[in-house]
Structures are given as C-alpha cells and as structure tokens.
C-alpha cells in the first residue's frame, strides 16, 4: 500500500496506550457514537472495542460487541416443524436448548403482556421511545389529535402552517431571518424532588451532584426508588456498577448481595444501555450473560430470565420473524417426510438477542412504516420529461426511480449530492411539495445553494420540531409529497421512526448518503440496514468526487491509501514525532500556514482529531487554539465573545457556532446564522470549544480547509470509516498532521466499519415489499 504524497515515516516509539484504551487486535474509533463530548460531564469517554466481546459489553470505555452472526436455521422454524409445514408427517426432531428457551420466553412474554393489559390501558405505540424522539412523537400526536396547535411547540411564535397544496413553480420571496431560539432544556426537576434525592445520596455515600441527574433519569419519585432499589442509580449517566454496589451496601447493609434480583436486573439494563452508546439496538444473549458473570452474578441464565420477566429487556430470536416456506411439499416432499438437511437445520441453535424496549419498538415501527410507504405510493407517475432534463445520467436515474417507488435508497459521495438536489427541483417543477432534510445547518446551506431555493432545504431536527419546513397538514402529517433525507447514515433508529410516522400514505421518501462515512451517533444503522435488506430500489451514483481530495477519499473508501497528484498543495502531509509537536504544528497551520498559502481565514479551517482526551485530543487542541486565536479570561462560563464553540442540544447533534455575548438569559451563540440562547444551567453540559472536533461531530459538515491530527497515541483508534470521514471534511485543502507511521495505511486497508447488532434488516426482509431491489 503506498503512502500519501510527501509522507514521512513516523517514529517507532508509538505510545503503548492509545487515547481510547483499545486493544490492538480489534481497533475501533476512539469516540463512541452518541457519547461525543456532549455528555462528558456525566459519561466517561467510550473507547475502542475490547478483544473479548463479553468484556466489551461491560467496560466503561469499551465498545459493546455486536455478536452478529447469521445463525438463522435455514428451512427450520422455532416450533420444530419443517419450513414447508409438513412436520406432522414424521416425528419432529427434539428442540435444541436455545429453541426450547425461546419458546418458553415467548410464553412468558405473553403472560407478561396479559398481566400488563389487566393492570392498565393498552400502551400506545411509541411509548418505548425516550428523550428527543419521545418529545417529538408526543408533539406529532398532540397536533394530530387537535389537542394543541403546531405553534404551541415553538419557543417563539412560529409561522402559520401552510395548507396542503401543490408547490408553486415560481421561486418564493426569501424568508425573514430566523427568530432567536432558546436551546431546549430538560424538564425542570422540582426543588423538593432534588432535595429528597440529595438526602438519600448523602445517606448512601454518593456524590450530591448526582441529585439533579438522578431526578432527570428516574423522575420525581427518584428518592423513593433509590431507597427501595439502590441499583437504580445505574440509570444515571456515568455511574458504574461498583459505585452502585457501594451505594446499595450503605443503604441496605447485609440485606443485599451480588445475586440480588434488583442488582441483576439493573445490570442487564446497564449492559444494554452501554451497548446502545456504541450503536447496538440489541446484544447477543450470551454476551449479556458473560457480562453478568464478570460482575459476580452466580447464575447469569436466571438473571437474564428474571430481567425479561420484569420487562427490563426483551428477548428475540434471530429467525423468529421469518415466514415458513411451504414449497417443500411441491418439490418432492409430498409425503411430508422431513429431509435430513431440514432436520439438521432445525437442530442448529437459534441466536437469541436481548434488547431494550425503546429500540425494539422503534425498529418495529420503522420497519412497518417503511413497508407502508413502499406499498402505498402511486407508482404510475410519469416523470420522463423531468428525467430527460436532468443534469447528469445519475440524476436522471434517480428521478425515474423515484417516480415509480415510494422508498428509494441513493448512495454516493459529496459530488453526488447534486442528484437529490436535481430530484427536488424536478419534483417542485411538477407541482409537488418536495423538500430535502440534512443532518446539519451547513448541509442545509449547501443543499439550498444546489437547488437554488432556500425554502426547500431544512435540517431534519428543524423539520421534525416544526421550526423549519412546510408544517403539518390537517391530519397532522408533514405537508409534503416528496422528502429526500441527505446524510442518511447519520439517521439513528429512533429519529427515523418518528420521521416515518410523520409521513402520510403516498409520500415518497428517498434516503441518500455516503455508505463510507461513520455511522449515526445514536443507536441503529438505518441506512446500512435498508441497503442490506434490499427492500426498495437502489440508485448508486456514478458521479466521482473531483480534485485531489476527492481522488484520495475515493481510494480510502475501497481500502486504498493512494498517492495523488496535488499540484496546488490541496493535500499536505506534516510529519510529527509526538503529541506535543502535533499540537504545535496544528496551531501553526490554522493560524499562519493555511491563511497565508490559500487565503482561507482561521475561522474557516476545522481541526479534526481522533478523540476528546489525550495530549492531542479536542480538549488540548482547543485550549492551545484559543490561546493563539482568541485569548481571554473566559468570563462567560469559560467562554469569551468570538470563541468558536460546538453546541450539543441533544446527544448526537453537534452544532458549530460562535459566542456573541452573554446575559441573564444565558450564553448567546450564532450557529450558522441562527441566533441561539443556551440557558446558564445548560452551558457547562452542552457547549464546548469548537476549533477542534471529533470526526463524529464533524460528520455531515464541510469547511474550506480541514486539518486532521493523527498523534501516535491515537493509532489504534483509527478505522477506514474514520479516515474516510475526517479526510473528506475539507473542500479546498487538507492538511494531515501525521504521527501514526504505518497505522494509517493499515487502518484504511484492514480496519473496516465496526459492526452494530440491530434487528431492522431481518424485520424489513420479513415484510412484503414488492419494490425490493433484485
């Protein structure tokens, strides 16, 4: 594998430990999806995957193992019959231990559901969602039922909802500047509840600072819950099992032990929550059992069963969604005999998965919603004339495909974003209400420029909240006919479920993105699962990314770190020996070299590094860059006017901005032209300096110049998707501060994307979707 042009081998003295603490045998990105510095005040940084999948699920800085494997028993069903349904013609083979356990767990789940139904009214779909997704779903249903107007969910007066009508062909007048918005804050905890929890924490020897987060996680009854079940403290972000054990011993004395049912149930939930931070929506049951055993649980099998019975987790069989195949009798098995191959297949173990109900409900709701869009769309639309006028063959193919399908997947690099823009413009020319939703404000701006109409581009968060876009129709659904979601790999399963539920029958949905970039910060892999399930037509762009940076990134996408010709110094390699030199050279590049050579000011250059910690992580780099570019005392909670920051209004959303001022209401930011006020109590937890970002934070955005910092101690945190994402953030110039020697080509060639365990793909494959890709 050839090195980058100008690359100089680094020193052999690579640090023994990288910033992630990952094992060399199984390197993974140092930054955990969903734990990107926005939760640093509460959550420890997650690191690379551990070599042992079980240890993976329990270590605070380890990536939970997905345990994914296609263990579906071909031709067999859980109840022991053959796939053709003829199992009654001969003695059925004995159930395997896993199959018997699955059947028993199914019966148990039925009893649990029956008991729940007797105690309370039926639970509406979506109640398993939480956080931003739950808030958005509640807002959608309140509007649908007429209980509240859409404007009730705006922090400031919102524009009146547009009636359902075809979009005018002529360009509309530009919108007035967006009103100042206040960053959403969690529901305030009552002083009484916080005081009660604080008293319990003090009694148990836990830090008083956990009082407010505990009320946020457990609700107003947190004090009572913690007193009766101290291990509920594990629901508070950042709390470790050993800390919860000490808290429980202080409160319960000798009345608790490692096999206490309250403890084991809380541990199961904790393991699954940790896995969700790494993107998994479920875990192999064996992985969970191993994690429990490492936490001194003597009978992990019983602990898992009890957790399922109590509703802490749900149990799934990998092949339980598959329908029996009744073709066997027609193929020579009319006598109903079970073939030896089928009998052997039925004896194969069934992979059992454990998952939290919020992600299970989200994946099931999303799968059903996508199938609804596929089957409800009018497929006889004639967009041939619009396709003929498309600016490229790939754009024409996308237009033709979208005309005949309710769900389409479009994949391509940065230059391929012109194709969804052409589709939106063509659809609006046909009188349809077509919009494009992006992951970031920067992506929204670039899409609006490509379409030529700023009103057609929104951020996904703005669309779902109602702050941007067409508003809702009289039925409470989004008032549109075609929606293109760009940056689709950044779409987590809960947000995707809320989005699809807000789309009416007949709406066309296009998921567009680059499969090579890092996945979503939240749990799930929606874009990859829809691609893998082949449940709808797929359009692969043939438009290459231009220039030396585009050529370099395209090679990385296929595992090759090629030499590229860069006559204009579009790609520059800066070798360094250690982290201290990496920080020094980075500051020099941003403040002097790049502005002088390319006339790109420092505020338009973005630094990207592997993780937040370490001698050359985002914190160290931001401190050095602030001292050089905007020194000051940090009189506004550590910030000064002119500081570049990143605002994290919700986990997984990083919004770059600049500090303008501060007053009694909070810290005032300018986030891509949108004024934002962050309340004082939220500044510490949701605002960080932003001259340097992690690659996850930078996903979905681009800058005129990017400086990627690769210190030697970050070598094991590199992967192909990480390098692909980081190197692709610069539009005109890319500098690589290179101190990882041969770890860079190794990562590109041999460290693919970290797998995530999800259920969306088999759910989609089991649903009837006539438009499935061949």
Name the predicted role of every residue range.
Residues 409-411, 435-437, 482-486, 510, ...:
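Structural motif
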Residues 240, 288, 366, 514, ...:
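Residue-level signature of catalytic and energy-coupling elements of molecular machines
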Residues 394-406, 419-428, 516-652, 660-662, ...:
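Conserved helicase motor core of P-loop NTPases
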């Amino acid at each position: 594998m050839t090195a980058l042009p100008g690359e100089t081998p680094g020193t052999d003295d690579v640090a023994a430990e990288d910033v992630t603490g990952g094992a060399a045998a199984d390197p993974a990105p140092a930054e955990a999806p969903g734990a990107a510095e926005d939760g640093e005040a509460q959550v420890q940084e997650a690191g690379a995957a551990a070599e042992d999948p079980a240890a993976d699920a329990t270590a605070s800085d380890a990536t939970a193992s997905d345990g994914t494997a296609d263990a579906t028993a071909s031709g067999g069903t859980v109840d022991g019959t053959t796939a053709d349904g003829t199992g009654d013609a001969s003695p059925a083979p004995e159930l395997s231990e896993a199959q018997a356990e699955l059947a028993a767990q199914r019966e148990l789940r039925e009893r649990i559901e029956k008991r729940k139904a007797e105690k309370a009214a039926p639970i509406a779909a979506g109640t398993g969602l939480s956080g931003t997704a739950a808030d958005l779903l509640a807002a959608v249903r309140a509007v649908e039922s007429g209980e509240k107007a859409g404007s009730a969910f705006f922090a400031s007066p919102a524009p009146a909802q547009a009636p359902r009508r075809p979009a005018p062909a002529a360009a509309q007048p530009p919108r007035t500047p967006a009103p100042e918005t206040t960053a959403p804050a969690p529901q305030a905890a009552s002083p009484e509840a916080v005081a009660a929890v604080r008293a319990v924490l003090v009694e148990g020897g836990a830090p008083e600072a956990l009082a407010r987060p505990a009320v946020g996680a457990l609700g107003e009854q947190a004090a009572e819950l913690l007193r009766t079940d101290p291990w509920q403290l594990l629901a508070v972000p950042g709390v470790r099992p050993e800390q919860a054990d000490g808290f429980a011993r202080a409160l319960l004395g000798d009345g608790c032990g490692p096999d206490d049912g309250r403890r084991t149930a809380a541990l199961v939930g904790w393991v699954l929550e940790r896995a969700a931070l790494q993107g998994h929506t479920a875990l192999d049951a064996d992985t969970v059992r191993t994690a429990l055993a490492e936490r001194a649980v003597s009978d992990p099998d019983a602990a898992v069963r009890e957790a399922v019975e109590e509703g802490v987790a749900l149990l799934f069989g990998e092949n339980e969604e598959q329908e029996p195949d009744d073709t066997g009798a027609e193929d020579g098995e009319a006598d109903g005999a079970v073939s030896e191959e089928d009998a052997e297949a039925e004896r194969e173990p069934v992979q059992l998965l454990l998952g939290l109900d919020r992600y299970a409900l989200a994946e099931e709701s999303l799968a059903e919603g996508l199938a609804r869009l596929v089957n409800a769309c009018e497929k006889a639309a004639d967009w041939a004339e619009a396709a003929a006028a498309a600016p490229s063959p790939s754009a024409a193919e996308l237009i033709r495909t979208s005309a005949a399908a309710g769900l389409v997947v479009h994949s391509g690099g940065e230059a391929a974003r012109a194709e969804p823009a052409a589709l939106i413009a063509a659809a609006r020319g046909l009188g349809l209400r077509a919009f494009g939703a992006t992951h970031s404000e920067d992506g929204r701006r670039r899409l609006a420029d490509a379409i030529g109409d700023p009103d057609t581009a929104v951020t996904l968060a703005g669309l779902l909240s109602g702050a941007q876009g067409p508003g809702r129709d009289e039925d409470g659904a989004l008032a549109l006919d075609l929606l293109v979601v760009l940056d689709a790999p950044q779409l987590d399963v809960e947000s995707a479920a809320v989005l699809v539920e807000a789309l009416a029958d007949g709406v066309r949905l296009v998921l567009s993105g680059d499969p090579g970039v890092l996945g979503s910060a939240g749990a799930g892999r929606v874009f990859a699962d829809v691609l893998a399930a082949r449940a709808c037509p797929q359009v692969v762009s043939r438009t290459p990314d231009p220039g030396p940076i585009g050529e370099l990134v395209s090679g990385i996408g296929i595992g090759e770190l090629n030499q590229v010709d860069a006559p204009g110094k579009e790609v520059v390699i800066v070798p360094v020996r250690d982290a201290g030199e990496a920080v020094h050279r980075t500051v020099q590049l941003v403040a002097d070299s790049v502005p002088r050579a390319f006339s790109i000011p420092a505020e338009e250059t973005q630094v990207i590094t592997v993780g937040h910690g370490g001698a050359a992580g985002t914190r160290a780099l931001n401190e050095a860059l602030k001292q050089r570019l905007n020194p000051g005392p940090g009189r506004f909670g550590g910030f000064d006017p002119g500081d570049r920051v990143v605002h994290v209004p919700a986990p997984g959303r990083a919004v770059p901005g600049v500090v303008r001022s501060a007053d009694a209401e909070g810290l005032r930011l300018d986030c891509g032209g949108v004024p934002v006020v962050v309340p004082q109590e939220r500044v510490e937890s949701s605002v960080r300096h932003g001259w340097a970002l992690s690659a996850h934070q930078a996903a979905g955005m681009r800058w005129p110049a990017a400086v990627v910092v690769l210190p030697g101690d970050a070598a094991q945190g590199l992967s192909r998707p990480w390098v692909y994402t980081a190197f692709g953030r610069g539009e005109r110039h890319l500098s690589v501060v290179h101190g990882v020697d041969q770890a860079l080509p190794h990562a590109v060639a041999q460290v693919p994307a970290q797998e995530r365990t999800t259920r969306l793909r088999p759910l989609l494959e089991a649903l009837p979707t006539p438009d499935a890709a061949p």
